[in-house]
Curated annotation (Swiss-Prot):
Component of the acetyl coenzyme A carboxylase (ACC) complex. Biotin carboxylase (BC) catalyzes the carboxylation of biotin on its carrier protein (BCCP) and then the CO(2) group is transferred by the transcarboxylase to acetyl-CoA to form malonyl-CoA. Its main location: cytoplasm. The lineage of its organism: Bacteria, Bacillati, Bacillota, Clostridia, Eubacteriales. This is Acetyl-coenzyme A carboxylase carboxyl transferase subunit beta. Pathway: Lipid metabolism; malonyl-CoA biosynthesis; malonyl-CoA from acetyl-CoA: step 1/1. Keywords: ATP-binding, Cytoplasm, Fatty acid biosynthesis, Fatty acid metabolism, Lipid biosynthesis, Lipid metabolism, Metal-binding, Nucleotide-binding, Transferase, Zinc, Zinc-finger. Pfam families: Carboxyl_trans, Zn_ribbon_ACC. Its EC number is 2.1.3.15. Coiled coil: none annotated. Residues 34-291 form the CoA carboxyltransferase N-terminal domain. Its cofactor is Zn(2+). Gene3D superfamilies: 2-enoyl-CoA Hydratase, Chain A, domain 1 (3.90.226.10). It comes from the Bacteria. One of its GO terms (molecular function) is ATP binding.
Amino acid sequence: MLKDLFKKSKYATVNPSAYKSKVVEEKPNIPSGMWTKCSNCNSMIYYEDLENNKYVCTKCNQHFRISPKERIKQIFDKDTFKEMWKSLKTNNPIDFEDYEEKINKSQSNTGSKEAVVTGVGRINDLEVACAIMDSFFMMGSMGTVVGEKITRIVEYATENNLPILIFTASGGARMQEGIFSLMQMAKISAALARHDEKGLLYITILTDPTTGGVTASFAMEGDIILSEPNTLVGFAGRRVIENTINETLPESFQKSEFLLEKGFIDSIVERKNMRAYLYKILILHGVNKYE
């Protein structure tokens, strides 16, 4: 009896490594790319739901950045968009170090030669010329080829009496091309002035982000200026301005809603309504059906 009082209890032992391996084995196998995170509300969104909602957050209505290919799919009649000057590609006019590598990387990532797609297409059978900037290609920065392609499509619209739509999405002039990139601001604006002299319609649609030299030139020259919700629109960065004027800017500063309030843009249009809204504007301005 006394022996039993001082007898050690028997304990079961667990092998931690065996338990750990079992837990690993039981983890669900979730394929990558099924979910994505909203940059605005941090919600996790099922990618298929996002795609079906035109890449707009189903929780907070944040408009995700989209490629020109997706934009064409959403705006134009099926199989009517014809891309023009697709083969134009950038050289290195000022021999900027590593510039070719950055271009090659962007081309590989996006499948595009440059940061803008230009061409003609139809919206409910109304023919328009169009330029769509690509924020995924070096942040949509404007170099010589971007400037040349936009100028050419504006000139094509002028010669063929077509309205022109430009979807802007850019970080501004491309620093790797120096003064040559800045020259594109005046070049595009001059082409748009000739388009305007013929009494033709020019609509700009500001998408996130629209900044720098693009904002300072053709983005704000439209006869009608539209924007997607919560779009960043500005010239210099917020911190640069605050440090220059030594003041704290409003939270909504450089957002499309702020610009609408101050009269810089005409309307904020949600992506799901953009095609119908553009069609109404084109009809009101007497754009004829495609023949």
